[in-house]
Amino acid sequence: MKKILYLFLALASYGISAQTTAEEYLNSAVSKFYLNDMKGAIVDYTKAIKIDTNYIEAYRKRGLAKETLKDYSGAIVDYTKAIEIDPNCAPAYRDRGIAKGKLKDHSGVVEDYTRAIEIDPNYATAYFNRGVSKFYLGDMIGACKDARKAQALGDDASILIKKACN
């Protein structure tokens, strides 16, 4: 009877140690991403998410892999999920704004960057990117204000300033 108990405990502990964690899948996915294996990265990000359904970083990084494959709508779904988990994650709004920009949804870009700026008022990149979308929407005054604010925060917004502020 003791042998059976030891065997059971040994098998149970092997099963526990053999389980891959969400972080391990994330690390594997990041490696695949940098090796330009986007499909493999997406598979591993998905495995990380199955283990931890609130893993914001996995959603954001999977979105980036989808974006790299030009699956902008799929990327937006992942970024939106990250935002649902943490509505104050400014980088997730930035990520989603970039994907919306690739789909020429400049109004959506402005909304996302406005929210990112509400969360982090010193987010220079958000001001710059929002300014670019305002430029495409024909709002030169808004584009110029955002470009000047981005520049004041350290972003090189000189090209946008030349186009929007003259």
Residue ranges and their predicted role:
Residues 2-166:
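Alpha-helical tetratricopeptide repeat
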